[in-house]
């Protein structure tokens, strides 16, 4: 009997370990593919030309009408971002929106460079200059 109990527990632990490993692999794949897409020349060009920018909600937005290729790229990146925010929310006991907002604040403050577009708290598009960007008062 004791051996059977140990065997059952071992199987449950094995299943759980396999699930955690699969989740980690999926997370790494999402993060890696997002980073690769962000190095895509079309993405970099659209960002540099001010066609797209960081939004306050943690997602990329269109400053002006995008080409189908840029729209597809940004849509794909936003799907990957949402997956990452969902993963982080589950791990931190937060909502997806909270994680997205925090990341949006960080991306606007730390990732945008002069000449790039970002969304101000009033939802207008601003062009980053040498000064600090205008961010939501709730940003950490």
Model regions and ranges:
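Sec/Tat signal peptide C-region and signal peptidase I cleavage site
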Residues: 31-37
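Amphipathic, charged alpha-helical segments and their helix-to-coil junctions
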Residues: 38-72, 97-140
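Bacterial N-terminal signal peptides
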Residues: 20-31
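Bacterial N-terminal signal peptides that target proteins for export
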Residues: 9-21
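Short, well-ordered alpha-helical segments
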Residues: 74-92
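Short, Lys/Arg-enriched N-terminal segments with co-localized hydrophobic residues
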Residues: 1-6, 12
């Amino acid at each position: 009997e004791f051996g059977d109990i140990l065997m059952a527990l071992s199987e449950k632990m094995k299943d759980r370990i396999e699930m955690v490993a699969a989740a980690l692999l999926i997370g790494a794949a999402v993060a890696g593919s997002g980073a690769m897409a962000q190095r895509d020349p079309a993405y970099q060009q659209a960002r540099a030309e001010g066609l797209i920018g960081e939004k306050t909600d943690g997602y990329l937005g269109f400053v002006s009408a995008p080409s189908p290729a840029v729209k597809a790229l940004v849509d794909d990146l936003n799907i990957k971002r949402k997956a990452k925010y969902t993963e982080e929310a589950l791990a931190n006991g937060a909502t997806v929106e909270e994680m997205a907002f925090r990341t949006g604040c960080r991306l606007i403050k730390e990732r945008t460079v002069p000449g790039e577009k970002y969304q101000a708290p009033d939802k207008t598009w601003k062009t980053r200059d040498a000064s600090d960007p205008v961010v939501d008062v709730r940003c950490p």
